[in-house]
Amino acid sequence: MKMAIVTGAARGIGLATARFFVDQGYQVAMVDRDEDALDAAAASLAGGTAFVCDVSDPAAVDEMVAAVLAVSGRIDCLVNNAGVADFCSIEDTSFARWRTVMATNLDGVYLCSRAVLAALKQSRGSIVNIASISGLRASTLRVAYGTSKAGVIHLTQQFAAEMGEFGIRVNCVAPGPVRTKLAIAVHSQAIIDAYHDAIPLNRYGSEAEIAEAIVFLGSEKASYITGQTLAVDGGFGSTGVGLPALRD
């Protein structure tokens, strides 16, 4: 049975992605640093196994990958979904705050991807990184977050360029506004209205819609796609419209 690793799998897009992989007949290694939430998520999903790990810790990542291989003997897909959201002005973004964002959002993607390469060479598998539309276009209050996600997009291309000769595909999904619990909690009505006005489809995406794109890129259905970033954003990136509501 094929094995997919999904980081940040305790909730949201990561959990939705794990469910879709299970539906496709995969075993899923569900990775997160929030042990309680991860255990609850894994208990709700037949075919999912919890692996507690902080992806910004190199030793912890190596241990996690070794543990997954001990269980499954193979890795066919890695989804680098773990991330932290941080919205702060440039002047108020300390270097410590900057590094906290980079450690998970960019370093974690590099560490996990590098750790699975030997296994993916054997399976001729794939990596799907989760960036953001904030990595494709600049916006206010996202100096660390947006830069980290832009780094993920370029890292995707670097890995694709170098790993293609081994049959490893590496792609990226850049979600637009998604109706997650976090978004519902932190987005004011003014922000929601502004997004709706700027999105041609006039709504937020769902976790399931993002997960569908991730699983597609990770599967053999995308066998001739590598080094690409797929914006799943309802057309938001095509409008070129700024959102004044996000300045507050």
PLM feature segments, named:
Residues S132:
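Residue(s) in the substrate-gating loop at a strand-loop-helix junction
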Residues C172, D193-I225, V232-G234:
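C-terminal helical subdomain
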Residues E35-D36, C53-E63, F95, A208:
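The beta1-alpha1 cofactor-binding region of Rossmann-like NAD(H)/NADP(H)-dependent oxidoreductases
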Residues S113, S148, T156:
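Active-site helix of classical SDR
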Residues S89-I90, R97-R99, Y195:
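Substrate-binding pocket helix/loop in short-chain dehydrogenase/reductase
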Residues A118, A161-E165, S223:
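Alpha-helical segment proximal to the catalytic Tyr-Lys
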Residues R137, T226-D248:
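Short C-terminal tail/terminal secondary-structure segment
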